Amino acid sequence: MGLRGGGGRAGGPAPGWTCLLLCAALRSLLASPGSEVNLLDSRTVMGDLGWIAYPKNGWEEIGEVDENYAPIHTYQVCKVMEQNQNNWLLTSWISNEGRPASSFELKFTLRDCNSLPGGLGTCKETFNMYYFESDDEDGRNIRENQYIKIDTIAADESFTELDLGDRVMKLNTEVRDVGPLTKKGFYLAFQDVGACIALVSVRVYYKKCPSVIRNLARFPDTITGADSSQLLEVSGVCVNHSVTDEAPKMHCSAEGEWLVPIGKCLCKAGYEEKNNTCQVCRPGFFKASPHSPSCSKCPPHSYTLDEASTSCLCEEHYFRRESDPPTMACTRPPSAPRSAISNVNETSVFLEWIPPADTGGRKDVSYYIACKKCNSHSGLCEACGSHVRYLPQQTGLKNTSVMMVDLLAHTNYTFEIEAVNGVSDQNPGARQFVSVNVTTNQAAPSPVSSVKKGKITKNSISLSWQEPDRPNGIILEYEIKYFEKDQETSYTIIKSKETAITADGLKPGSAYVFQIRARTAAGYGGFSRRFEFETSPVLAASSDQSQIPIIVVSVTVGVILLAVVIGFLLSGSCCDHGCGWASSLRAVAYPSLIWRCGYSKAKQDPEEEKMHFHNGHIKLPGVRTYIDPHTYEDPNQAVHEFAKEIEASCITIERVIGAGEFGEVCSGRLKLQGKREFPVAIKTLKVGYTEKQRRDFLGEASIMGQFDHPNIIHLEGVVTKSKPVMIVTEYMENGSLDTFLKKNDGQFTVIQLVGMLRGIASGMKYLSDMGYVHRDLAARNILINSNLVCKVSDFGLSRVLEDDPEAAYTTRGGKIPIRWTAPEAIAFRKFTSASDVWSYGIVMWEVMSYGERPYWEMTNQDVIKAVEEGYRLPSPMDCPAALYQLMLDCWQKDRNSRPKFDEIVSMLDKLIRNPSSLKTLVNASSRVSNLLVEHSPVGSGAYRSVGEWLEAIKMGRYTEIFMENGYSSMDSVAQVTLEDLRRLGVTLVGHQKKIMNSLQEMKVQLVNGMVPL
């Protein structure tokens, strides 16, 4: 394409130029991105543009049509042979629609002045662009000096006569932004000062973030801000039939992209999510809670005829307990027990039966025993008295047998065995029971219930008692059995027809145990309970003096107890442990605190005080608190209290994705009754486990089951009733955060990385609020899903500090490097939320360095020493200064000076809302001199030449560049900074990191500098 130059017609097109120009225009008719809204596009205007050129012999419109006969508007000017050119092209009024800013895109061609013979003195290769704001769309009387200059436009490529011959089109595209704009519209003007130019198209547009539905929240069309670095926070509105879970927000960037989604909406009960909408549950389906994933089919024996049902109604004769979940089938009372048999033994009856044929669909079947005493003559029955005892119990029986004792002899009884379950009390129908009629036999007497001591000497004890409550005949005699305490195998029998005896020949000052039973014609009754009495010491002469030993012993015990209490108070333990009167006062002062079965507490700092409960816990109104499962006497109770039992048949294991100490980690799918199948992660317990390993394995589930937060890994349930034992959690597609970052080095924006850190901090705030200390927060223990949502995991193992030179925490799962652990936790085993904050700072460093190993190859001992001396990790490459400062705050030696997790979340939210604060990076030139001392580093002396060093790190391609720029020795190389690398032409980020990391290792021998706090 070209304009005729030289002595011909200065503004006329060269032969064939119009055709080429039209071809270029057609090729440039590309659709604008969805985030751009055109205010003017000269390529799409069908009629006259209405633009004005002056002087009239300046800009010239070339009117052509495309293959669809649509007009193509092109303006050209080529007054290159004449001096002092001032040719203006004015557009018509362009409505700005009240937008704060607009962008202008120009497509044009420009002739190379050197290719125009004779025009070098007057030819120009630029033109000027102006605008004038106006509320008047009819005003054209605008003076030149009223226009505001936007820019001088130069071509990236100009064309020559040779390009015309080769049919090469060099079309330039320039974009300029103008803002802020305050009036309804504006005019554009293009000034030619002597160039040979063709203006192919002019497009005026503004950018917006298009309306979108994300996480069931609708975000409207949002015009971008006038500042190119500004992020606009936009609140979303929940779609129809949804409710807010966490206030939905997103940020609109200057490029028209939605970034950093926060919060979400959930379909309300009776609706499920489909294609970013909440669809009604159709009849026969229900959804009880917004947190349920989808509509579920009504469980067995229930139905719903309406749409949007939140629960299902039970069929006739079927019921649901108030505590039954809505996903559970409706059930009915059980049928009667079957095949009851009895076995009479004097005045005891043993009953046994078979469970009912129909349990009603429930597992909570129990039995109730009704006892009736019947008159053999009248046939009338009455309830048995309270003297009848039931072994093990009368109500709530779980097994299918019971024994009734202490019945009357020669009496007719009717026993009714009724089966009941959780919905029996809702059944208005008749009771379901089976009856058994029995007659008791002649019976032996009941046991003696009360024994009184009489005269006691050093060698004898006198006793008396009352006749049994139920003699069941004439008492023929009593049998008294006694023995020295703890000598039960050597006993003496005395028989007496009276209710009193004296046992002689006993040892002075010794304890003896007595038992008594009665005999009738039916035989001996049972022995009484044990009664313990003690003979007098040798010094005691009479029963009057028999109380002296008791007094002496009591005084002695009292003195000992007093000494213990005084010593305890003086040691300060009483105050720390809440014992004695201090504990009593505390109980009075705080009546809202309820203790069960007592507690013990280790001596520690006030902020670290924790109560360890035995088979119970403390409850505070309105506060959800983490409960340590190790405080349960039965670990299985903790598992079943906090974790849901899942049938193994509901789980499909697909493949192994990892392995641990206890077994394999697999991915699979979970299909629960009435719910859709969804992916899960499954931890299995290996074959041949010990009971201790099983407790440790399920301990993690007991902990995880207490948490419910979008940034904490969610426990679906456990499998404990079949093998293998399994823990089932949600599936995180991208795995551990450290591995994911290494695989995607440099692929994310700073805002995305901050979003990840914000999620981790939010999860840790939740744990901290519950009183849970993680102890092993590291990127390897953070899982990330396909939406880049990070979730805290690994709650399973207790940690013990070993006395080894590596000073590493040891768990049942292996050693945890101390490089994530706060110094007070290393030195004093003080684990608190503040020590978790230290670990969070290390996680921040891992994220911003894309998974680099903290402290590189330093040994644990070197890390401990360096941290104790006040040195800290240097800033990762290209790390915003605000984030690195937050890391340093997390690494304060005084744990009380570290920020709390709620403060960290607030700081990160502010950075996300103001992304311009993330543009200030840590001074790159200071990074190398901020290194930590490494243990046994590879120093500069390990390589004989720069080339050998670069080859060793597989960067040999840069050898010649280093040598040409004066880096000929290893000493000079050791001083290279990141800016030096960029100046040398090392532009690939991965190569920069590899070279800088190697320099960091060498620096220890040349620069003994760190980052002191």
UniProtKB/Swiss-Prot annotation:
The modification Phosphotyrosine is found at Y626, Y632, Y809, Y958. The keyword Ribosomal protein does not apply. SUPFAM superfamilies: Fibronectin type III, Galactose-binding domain-like, Growth factor receptor domain, Protein kinase-like (PK-like), SAM/Pointed domain. Keywords: ATP-binding, Cell membrane, Cell projection, Glycoprotein, Kinase, Membrane, Neurogenesis, Nucleotide-binding, Phosphoprotein, Receptor, Repeat, Signal, Transferase, Transmembrane, Transmembrane helix, Tyrosine-protein kinase. Residues 571-1013 are cytoplasmic. GO terms for biological process: axon guidance; ephrin receptor signaling pathway; hippocampus development; regulation of actin cytoskeleton organization; regulation of GTPase activity. PROSITE patterns: EGF_2, EPH_LBD, FN3, PROTEIN_KINASE_ATP, PROTEIN_KINASE_DOM, PROTEIN_KINASE_TYR, RECEPTOR_TYR_KIN_V_1, RECEPTOR_TYR_KIN_V_2. GO terms for molecular function: ATP binding; GPI-linked ephrin receptor activity; transmembrane-ephrin receptor activity. Its main location: membrane. Residues 1-31 form the signal peptide. It holds the Pfam family Ephrin_lbd. Residues 651-912 form the Protein kinase domain. The chain crosses the membrane at residues 550-570. Glycans are attached at N240, N275, N345, N399, N412, N437. Its EC number is 2.7.10.1. Gene3D superfamilies: ephrin a2 ectodomain, Galactose-binding domain-like, Immunoglobulins, Phosphorylase Kinase, domain 1, Transcription Factor, Ets-1, Transferase(Phosphotransferase) domain 1, Tumor Necrosis Factor Receptor, subunit A, domain 2. Residues 333-443, 444-538 form the Fibronectin type-III domain. ATP binds at I657, G658, A659, G660, E661, F662, G663, E664, V665, K683. It is found in: Cell membrane; Cell projection, Axon; Cell projection, Dendrite. Residues 36-214 form the Eph LBD domain. Heterotetramer upon binding of the ligand. The heterotetramer is composed of an ephrin dimer and a receptor dimer. Oligomerization is probably required to induce biological responses. Receptor tyrosine kinase which binds promiscuously GPI-anchored ephrin-A family ligands residing on adjacent cells, leading to contact-dependent bidirectional signaling into neighboring cells. The signaling pathway downstream of the receptor is referred to as forward signaling while the signaling pathway downstream of the ephrin ligand is referred to as reverse signaling. Among GPI-anchored ephrin-A ligands, EFNA5 most probably constitutes the cognate/functional ligand for EPHA5. PANTHER family: EPH RECEPTOR A5, EPHRIN TYPE-A RECEPTOR 5. Belongs to the protein kinase superfamily. Tyr protein kinase family. Ephrin receptor subfamily. This is Ephrin type-A receptor 5. It comes from Gallus gallus (Chicken). The gene is EPHA5.
